[in-house]
């Protein structure tokens, strides 16, 4: 996970349920990974493992700690992102139940601090302003409010470009 709900709440004050915030954070993580074509993998933390249920077994010392985000690749059944919930010297466990499989590649995913802060800003904007998208202005009596326009070149991925600019250094070329 790009950021825990508790970490997000330390940056932004909101009364939304933890489940809602967790789902939105997971969606933003996938959106950013697709947009940048960047997996944010730390290849120094990589091992081959066998999967049984939700437990990964490595032949050597495994490099993951509780709370780490991992990416499973070279897998026919379980490719994806998971969070480590328990770890020993040669095994680690994730919350999801997976299909049994041998010889998958597991790599730690590490997001830079500026990406985490950008995600916090994007989610804060989403919570506070998403409902106002499409409304250009409103007037009540002598009070008038004009909102940010989200058409044309002002928006990227459904967010104002000013909120997505932090991703530019992380975009990888795709051919």
Where do the PLM segments sit?
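Short capping micro-motif at the N-terminus of alpha-helices
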Residues: 147-149
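Conserved short "hinge" loops at termini or chain/domain junctions
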Residues: 1-117, 130, 153-175
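Short acidic-hydrophobic surface loop/beta-edge motif
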Residues: 136-140
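Short helix-capping/linker segments at secondary-structure and domain boundaries
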Residues: 127-134
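Short Cys/His-centered divalent metal-binding micro-motifs
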Residues: 123
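Glycine- and small hydrophobic-enriched segments that form the cores of compact globular domains
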Residues: 142-144
